[in-house]
Swiss-Prot record:
This is NADH-quinone oxidoreductase subunit N. NDH-1 shuttles electrons from NADH, via FMN and iron-sulfur (Fe-S) centers, to quinones in the respiratory chain. The immediate electron acceptor for the enzyme in this species is believed to be ubiquinone. Couples the redox reaction to proton translocation (for every two electrons transferred, four hydrogen ions are translocated across the cytoplasmic membrane), and thus conserves the redox energy in a proton gradient. Belongs to the complex I subunit 2 family. GO terms for molecular function: NADH dehydrogenase (ubiquinone) activity; NADH:ubiquinone reductase (non-electrogenic) activity; quinone binding.
Amino acid sequence: MTAETILLSLHLSAPELILAVGALVLLMVGVFSGERSGLVVTGLAIVLLLASGLWLLFVPAEGLAFGGVYMADGFSRFMKLVALIGSLVALFMTMGHARENQLDKFEFPVLLVLATLGILLMISANDLISLYLALELQSLALYVVAAINRDSLKSTEAGLKYFVLGALSSGMLLYGMSLVYGFTGHTHFTEIAQALSVEGARSLGLIFGLVFILAGIAFKISAVPFHMWTPDVYEGAPTPVTAFFAAAPKVAAMAMLTRIVITAFQPVLADWQQVVVFISIASMLLGSFAAIGQKNIKRLMAYSSIGHMGYALVGLAAGNQTGVSGVMLYMVIYMIMTLGTFAIIMSMRRKDGTVVEDVNDLAGLSATNPFMAVVLTALMFSLAGIPPLAGFFAKYFVFVAAIEAKLYALAIIGVLASVVGAYYYLRVIKLMWFDEATGEFARVSSALRLVFGLSGLFVTAYVLIGGPIGGAAELAAATLF
């Protein structure tokens, strides 16, 4: 590599370099800043994430870096901005609640920055090896974050369960990659696509490799049948950590899955489409039915998340440009709805400081905290896909893509699953507005109020402000085709 290509590579990967160098600086600051290290490092971590996002926004650069293993294009830029917003909001939400969740250690924001670095690299990965390394960087940070509350048995259990199942999924992914490399002789996505375009290149071993890769990535997005870790980890991990898990890593994994199937495996679309359709249907149905009996609101959100990943996969199964832009839009709307809901869950504490997570504790919320009740009602209606809220448009675009691809059965099952899924969202609304209050919540912090207030505003005003976001998603999706 010449000096010119090295400089070009560094320029293209500047958002990641900001986080990588910044994380090392944060470690030094944390060691030398005494008792207030947690707060200082969290503030600096937010500045780092902002700097990375602003670079992406105002210094658009496209091209291949580091010998073609890193791709900077419109798709990666869009998804990175979404993921950075998710990380930024999740970190901002922890600031007022760090001590009670054992998150006041300076290592926590550093781990979040390292996980976000892995997330950005995952989105730009253009090679099987760079994809795996980025995925592991993100995963290793998240394993520690899940178990960071050492005084909580549930948190420790969540971290251990996530680690064991995560290691299993990484092994499946790596085995799939080795099969694909063995049958094509390449690890670059574009070269894999060229090798698969040759007549007779599609062999049984290659299809096995593809299935293993899809299985490994399905674990990361909590898709059925690789969802087992999600309810336990969501319930056991500290709530600010769960909010992060539900946002940025899901965006990155979905972006990674989209890039690999559209760029590398487009010539064998008929093969991976069947697998994605199955995973999508299973996720939608399990997410809708399993959430009905849940009492813990974090477990309910875990099954809701599984269902939503199923809906997003409807767009990916279509395998067309409309589907990809639908997936991108779905992830934006899903992330904002989820972060808003978790901001409200973090606000569920009694005046004596007791944290409550039972759905029934929301009873009578409209009488004790009308603003929170109104926002949560809007978010629940949006998660259920009720028009004219943002969640309706998210589902509408992926179903339209499925119909364009003649996947009529998939679209019909998706609509029916939405109807079933609406039950548990409406149950929460009924509790808030029609049941007697069981007690008042403590005063909500201004940070959380800001997050859920803006989320509620977004889902209700999406019909007016959604045009530019949809247009940006379409332009970004076009770069993959």
